[in-house]
Amino acid sequence: RIDGKLIANRLEPGKRPRSSMAPTIVLKDGRPIIIIGSPGGSNIISFVVNSIIALLEWDMNIQEAVSHPHAINKWGKFEIEESLYSSNLENSLKAMGYDTKIRKYYSGLNGIYIDTEIYGGSDPRREGIALGN
């Protein structure tokens, strides 16, 4: 409480956040190298983390990373974005015991990658813009 008023979304043990917002800044040697965020309700965290992995582990540039199709595991069911769908992927997931669901996603990621220059990337699934040098 502040001045006797309850604080919405205050951090407390056992509470769940009222939002999945995940605006993220990734640092390297104390300096920002990635700034990224997305709308998308309960999918936001997966959208952001998948894009960071695409940048850092799969050597995609920022535009490729925010445009990449999604496959998200929710409570044991893999939701596969239509543009990523293949029967091989679906059959492989089912062979591992996962249920699957094919769907559209409207992530709307926007991000900036900073190296020797600044690069912007904006998800083509929604309107947006992120500019670099």
Regions found by a protein language model. Name each.
Residues 39-60:
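Alpha-helical support elements that line or immediately flank enzyme active sites
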Residues 35-39, 77-80:
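Second-shell loop/turn segments in exported
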Residues 25, 48, 65, 112:
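Hydrophobic, well-ordered secondary-structure elements that form the walls
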Residues 6, 18-21, 47, 73, ...:
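Short, solvent-exposed loop/turn segments at the edges of secondary structure
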Residues 33-34, 42-45, 74, 85-88, ...:
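Flexible loop/turn segments at secondary-structure boundaries
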Residues 1-34, 58:
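Active-site rim segments in enzyme catalytic domains, especially the processed small/beta chain
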Residues 14-17, 57-105:
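Extended C-terminal subregions enriched in glycine
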Residues 85-133:
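Cofactor-centric catalytic regions
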